[in-house]
Amino acid sequence: MNHDKSPIILIGFMGTGKSTIGKYVADEQNLSFIDIDSYIEEKYKLTIPEIFCKHGEQYFRNLEFTCLQECINTADIIATGGGIIESEEAFNFLKNQKNIIWLDCNIDIIYSRINDDPHRPNANNKTIKQLNDLYCSRNLRYNEIAFKKFDSHLLSISEIYYELLNLIKASDQY
């Protein structure tokens, strides 16, 4: 990565396609990609649910922010966890970044993707109403820091890819 260029940072609720889209774009453009959740699991040798269980959500949010700071100058594309905006430090840090892309999706589709996924501690055993409440509570924050929003349930991966390519070219990056 050219360190003078800002990474593309994918934000959005869990299950909206941040990791899938990030990896796809990185593979297609031969760019570096880091999924913050995977990075945390590799670095700390614990799964996200194990971290939540052993240390709590606040501890995890602190790790998430620390890892985002570590990765900000080393990756071309970064997929964040859906709750990264819950931390004031991370939220304020992201506000100062340039290429924040918000991937959004219909809550019914999100629910079908993540319902009973044991790797998602904030979704586990939640009703669609509980998940929707969490989703709604985060949307204002995503909107506040996003440079561009894509509805991943309305666009295919390749359509989002081409839209991102146009953004990259428009900002003369990579």
Swiss-Prot record:
Entry GO MF terms: ATP binding; magnesium ion binding; shikimate kinase activity
UniProt: ATP binding residues: 15-20, 120
InterPro entries found in the cross-reference section: P-loop_NTPase (IPR027417), Shikimate/glucono_kinase (IPR031322), Shikimate_kinase/TSH1 (IPR000623), Shikimate_kinase_CS (IPR023000)
The record's free-text note on cofactor binding: Binds 1 Mg(2+) ion per subunit.
Function: Catalyzes the specific phosphorylation of the 3-hydroxyl group of shikimic acid using ATP as a cosubstrate.
Enzyme Commission number: 2.7.1.71
Protein name: Shikimate kinase
Principal location: cytoplasm
Family indicated by similarity: Belongs to the shikimate kinase family.
A GO cellular component entry from the record: cytosol
GO biological process assignments: amino acid biosynthetic process; aromatic amino acid family biosynthetic process; chorismate biosynthetic process
Listed PANTHER family: SHIKIMATE KINASE (PTHR21087), SHIKIMATE KINASE 1, CHLOROPLASTIC (PTHR21087:SF16)
Binding site for Mg(2+): 19
Known catalytic reactions: shikimate + ATP = 3-phosphoshikimate + ADP + H(+)
Needed cofactors: Mg(2+)
Cell compartment(s), UniProt: Cytoplasm
Keywords from the UniProt entry: Amino-acid biosynthesis, Aromatic amino acid biosynthesis, ATP-binding, Cytoplasm, Kinase, Magnesium, Metal-binding, Nucleotide-binding, Transferase
Binding site for substrate: 37, 61, 82, 138
Organism (species): Staphylococcus aureus (strain NCTC 8325 / PS 47)
Pathway given in the UniProt record: Metabolic intermediate biosynthesis; chorismate biosynthesis; chorismate from D-erythrose 4-phosphate and phosphoenolpyruvate: step 5/7
Pfam name, any one: SKI
Assembly mode: Monomer.
Top-level EC class as recorded in UniProt: transferase
